[in-house]
C-alpha cells in the first residue's frame, strides 16, 4: 500500500514539475470567445426609458464574462431597434486582433449611430473599454492610414473627424465640415 501511495505521489510530483498546464492555468485567448448580445427593455411606469445592452463573452472553458452598455435614452419604440446591440468585430487599435464594437443606437433620424468599443488586451487577456475624449459616430476604420473615422450628419451638414492612436490613446487629429452634396461628389 505504501508503495502505491509513494508511486502515486511521485507521479503527481513529476507531472507538476513537467510544466503541463492544469485547468487552473488556463489563460483565455481572443480566439477562444463566442459572442452574443441581449437588449433588455427597462420599464418605468410602463414607458420605455432606455435599453440595457449586455454582451456575453463565453470562452473555450465555458466561463462567461458580461460587458454592459446603455442604449441611447430615446423612446426606442419609435426607432428601428434592428441594429441596437449589434456586435461587430474590427481591429480598432491596429494590433491584428479583433476588438468588439457594440451599437448603442442612433442619435437622430439621420443615423449617426454611436457605439461602445472594447479593445482586446493581449497582456491581460481581457477586453477593456475604449476611452476616448470625443464621441465617435457611425465609425469606419481606415486601415491604410491607421485611423478611425467618425461621421456626423444633420440635414445637409456633415462633420468628419479622424482619430489616431497616440501613446495608447485614441485622439482627434483632423476635423472637417462639408455639405452632404460635397460628400456625395467625392
Where are these regions (language model features)?
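N-terminal, post-signal-peptide region of Sec/Tat-exported proteins
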Residues: 49-83
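Acidic, small-residue rich beta-repeat scaffolds with periodic aromatic anchors
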Residues: 5-8, 16-56, 139-186
